[in-house]
């Protein structure tokens, strides 16, 4: 998991259930919930200059993310931002925990096309959903509509796919935090990706060259080629070749065989959201029949 911090920290989240609200508690740098993270900038050889387009991406204080829209949302709907569950401003979600409908004051910087400038800052009013179970996602509701953001900053949201991506798909991982783009392809899918106590299912494995993601790239959108569709969300990489430990995820196949791939990065699925969206397209309905997202116990 790729949070940026000069002290290599990992933030945490408190356990909450549907409908529960609680004041936001940011964990400061150096807190006892520290989690080792890389923070060095990427090697320029890993960045495809020709594929850089940062419109729709956002920079968080510790991670990357994107301004997103699902198919049903209207221009007058409140806008959404998508990032990793381990990037939220609260305590780290433990295995099995799901957080929903929490107040939030998180801020996100919108970047211009080349990431040379910050066009402005948008603000969350709620964290609609966050988890590190089966996937690693957090979805924020903003206090502005898509239409208002377009009028003020000229930014359109990125569309989130409703289909599972295919192996071999060329991808760009666009990090708003580092203002860098990584280019590779989807090598395949992992039935079970283990990292310490967390388990991610149907994880996206990156090809060997081009996507050696680092701290701060967590939550960056995985964009399919040049069509600007988000087909996944960047998450983690095996840094040291260790087996199933923090910052060293391992693959578990359907027979239970464990495989370690040092230097290989992974993302998580996002199409699951479509199975859980309310008719508004900006609310998560975990009781909807067929909803694939994990639910609070």
Region spans (language model):
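Active-site substrate-binding loop(s) of clan PA
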Residues: 66-72, 125-131, 141-181
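Bacterial N-terminal signal peptides
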Residues: 10-20
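PDZ/PDZ-like groove recognition
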Residues: 138, 255-297
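Active-site region of chymotrypsin-like
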Residues: 52-63, 145-155, 180-273
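Bacterial N-terminal signal peptides that target proteins for export
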Residues: 2-11
